[in-house]
């Protein structure tokens, strides 16, 4: 679709098929390579069901985000929707926590990449897995941040290259795993699916990790679904560039479910092949790329790991470019100080990059590079958006504002699905064991506690103070809308 012309050039909008492909590419990332071990350990032979439940939940929330795009066509997704529904007072908190969540997500991805790289390069060295503050892993992490900064200096062409590299890497690795795995299963009559029982142990269910209620399959599935949901993260960012899409109010609600269904089918096929090859091997593996543990052939296993590594590298480059821009967008809108949006001669917002990189490094250090806890944190941090955006959609659907008058209401997508998203989000959020974030070896993790307080309380509070100080300075009163 060709849009309006700017300076003599036609602006090409993303059509329906392009939005579907964007959705698939946004969702399929490192998650499917990293999460199967933990999910099998938590759910045993029911691991595929955990991915199905995670996919259904992701689909519901994705439709909620897409439906909200019918009312708000500007870029920004959760920040734009919340601001339109409740005004700046709520929008500021969502915008700031969204930027923080993106920084955490980048840190988790960078941690996975560094851990995998060190294990591939130095497989028999104990120092490659050291978790101390001053360790080879920390130094490699800092070096990797430096490499990403250098790549950012090359601008958009480097980002396009990174996206292409990531797509090729993950497509090659998944295709090789599925095709090669099916060939082994059919020619050698391999079926180790039942070994998932040996890896399974029922997990106690406790509210917020404090009040234990019971122990059984339900509690295990709840935690397994949270971990599996990491493999679907990315769907919430599809609507970020709504202005670049052709008829987003019509295409997004149709494209996102198709993308989620396609990704879910790929994940189920991948997981089934992996569990047939060796469920117990995946669950017992100490490697970052758990999926490769099911493969007995060393060469084949290396191909999968390298493909996953290439995919993670590309995703990290894209995250290092996108996450700082969330801070600059808030600065451009007056929510944060303008110096956060200042760019150097290479068009890189250095202050925002430094803030993002600091948060990206801080959380993996606080959680001692623990992959399971980092995965949980990356998912739980997103629940602020998963709860507030559905509430915002309900408010937008009830709005009688002129700009929303032309939008056709649909009781199912405007009310039922948002309520389902809220209930499930709250249920999953209270099911998570937060002790893994706030405690370490039985004692308080003061580093992690301080980070949570600073990022989710202090920083938003400072944003509010800055915004209202600016409002008073220009002699205007902030609108509650």
Swiss-Prot record:
Superkingdom field: Bacteria
GO molecular function: transmembrane transporter activity
InterPro entries: AA/rel_permease1, APC_superfamily
Keyword Heme: no
Transmembrane segments: 14-34, 46-66, 90-110, 134-154, 167-187, 218-238, 258-278, 303-323, 377-397, 411-431, 446-466
Subcellular location field: Cell membrane
Pfam families: AA_permease_2 (PF13520)
Record carries keyword Transmembrane helix: yes
UniProtKB keywords: Cell membrane, Membrane, Transmembrane, Transmembrane helix, Transport
Membrane topology note: Multi-pass membrane protein
UniProt main location, coarse: membrane
GO CC aspect terms: plasma membrane
The family this protein is said to belong to: Belongs to the amino acid-polyamine-organocation (APC) superfamily.
Protein task: Probable amino-acid or metabolite transport protein.
Protein's name according to its UniProt entry: Uncharacterized transporter Mb2001c
Natural source organism: Mycobacterium bovis (strain ATCC BAA-935 / AF2122/97)
């Amino acid at each position: 679709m060709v849009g309006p012309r700017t300076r003599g050039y036609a602006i090409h909008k993303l059509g329906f098929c392009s939005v579907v492909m964007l959705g698939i590419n946004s969702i399929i990332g490192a998650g499917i390579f990293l999460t199967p071990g933990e999910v099998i350990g938590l759910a045993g032979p029911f691991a595929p069901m955990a991915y199905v439940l995670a996919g259904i939940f992701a689909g519901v929330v994705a439709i909620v985000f897409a439906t909200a795009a019918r009312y708000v066509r500007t870029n920004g997704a959760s920040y734009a929707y919340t601001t339109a529904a409740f005004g700046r007072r709520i929008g500021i908190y969502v915008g700031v926590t969204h930027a923080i969540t993106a920084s955490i997500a980048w840190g988790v991805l960078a941690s996975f990449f560094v851990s995998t790289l060190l294990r591939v390069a130095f497989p028999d060295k104990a120092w490659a897995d050291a978790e101390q503050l001053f360790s080879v892993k920390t130094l490699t992490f800092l070096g990797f941040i430096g490499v990403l900064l250098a790549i950012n200096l090359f601008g958009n062409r480097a980002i396009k290259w990174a996206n292409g590299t990531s797509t090729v890497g993950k497509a090659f690795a998944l295709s090789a795993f599925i095709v090669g795995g099916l060939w082994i299963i059919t020619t050698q009559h391999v079926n180790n699916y039942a070994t998932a029982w040996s890896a399974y142990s029922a997990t106690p269910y406790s509210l917020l990790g404090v009040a234990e209620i019971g122990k059984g399959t339900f509690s295990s599935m709840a935690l397994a679904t949270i971990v599996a949901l990491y493999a679907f993260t990315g769907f919430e960012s599809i609507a970020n560039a709504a202005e670049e899409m052709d008829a987003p109010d019509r295409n997004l609600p149709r494209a996102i479910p198709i993308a989620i269904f396609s990704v879910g089918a790929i994940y189920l096929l991948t997981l089934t092949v992996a569990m047939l090859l060796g469920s117990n091997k995946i669950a017992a593996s100490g490697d970052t790329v758990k999926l490769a543990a099911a493969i007995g052939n060393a060469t084949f296993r290396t191909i999968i790991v390298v493909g996953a590594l290439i995919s993670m590298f590309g995703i990290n480059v894209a995250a290092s470019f996108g996450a700082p821009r969330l801070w600059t967008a808030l600065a451009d809108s007056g929510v944060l100080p303008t110096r956060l949006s200042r760019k150097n001669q290479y068009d890189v917002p250095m202050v925002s990059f430094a803030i993002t990189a600091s948060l990206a490094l801080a959380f993996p250090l606080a959680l001692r590079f623990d992959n399971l806890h980092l995965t949980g944190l990356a998912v739980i941090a997103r629940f602020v958006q998963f709860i507030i955006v559905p509430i915002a959609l309900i408010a937008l659907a009830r709005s009688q504002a002129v700009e929303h008058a032309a939008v056709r209401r649909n009781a199912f997508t405007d009310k039922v699905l948002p309520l389902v998203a809220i209930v499930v989000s709250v249920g999953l959020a209270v099911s998570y064991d937060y002790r893994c974030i706030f405690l370490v070896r039985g004692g308080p993790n003061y580093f992690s506690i301080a980070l949570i307080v600073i990022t989710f309380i202090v920083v938003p509070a400072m944003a509010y103070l800055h915004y209202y100080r600016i409002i008073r300075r220009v002699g205007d009163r902030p609108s509650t809308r």
